[in-house]
Amino acid sequence: LHINLRRYVGGHPMAGSHQSGPLTAAPELFVDRTWVISARPENPDWAVERTRQLALTCQARIRELDAAEHDRAVAEVSHFPQLVASLTAARLAQVPSEDLRLAGQGVRDVTRIAASDVTMWRQIVSANTAPIREQLVAMRDDLDHLIGALDDPRVVIDLLTRGNEGVRALPGKRGKRPDEVISVVVEIPD
């Protein structure tokens, strides 16, 4: 079979949740979310424009990246965090149930995305192994450093401080700056 892929313009929205399927669809899912477009030189202009129009119709924000930039960026902010959440959650399966009762909301926050569709994530990971591996190796180096210096409060403080900085660097909800979003805390019993 010969398939002409000239018209195929790579791209996808950076939106979704750990849930999948039509029953979890939401009309505002792509509103104000980033939609990556990875056009190739052989793509006709009309095909790239049609892809842009699809993203704009969904009220998404377009970001154009080449394939290598895309793969590196999504490894950093999507694929690697998914695997870290899954590694953390997998360790919980070994924890005695009475100890799991001590878990607070923080553990749920860290592991929420580990409940994502396994088949989808197997495909994503297998399609982007090199950039993901770079992130995992960097984390392994960070873990080795932390393990070796865990008794040094300066190292622990440095890690926690850099963690705070990383959280502050993230954009707020739907791409807005964090100070443009108001937090409202509502207690909902589990």
Which sequence ranges carry the predicted segments?
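Rossmann-fold NAD(P)-binding glycine/threonine-rich loop
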Residues: 1-29
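Short N-terminal or domain-adjacent regulatory/targeting segments
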Residues: 9-15, 21, 156-171
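Short, flexible, solvent-exposed loop/turn segments with mixed acidic/basic and small polar residues
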Residues: 23-29, 123, 171-178
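Internal alpha-helical scaffold of NAD(P)-dependent oxidoreductase catalytic cores
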Residues: 29-115
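Short amphipathic alpha-helical segments
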Residues: 31-33, 120, 180-184
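Interdomain hinge/lid region at the active-site interface
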Residues: 96-164, 184
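A conserved regulatory-domain signal marking ACT and ACT-like small-molecule sensing domains
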Residues: 166-190
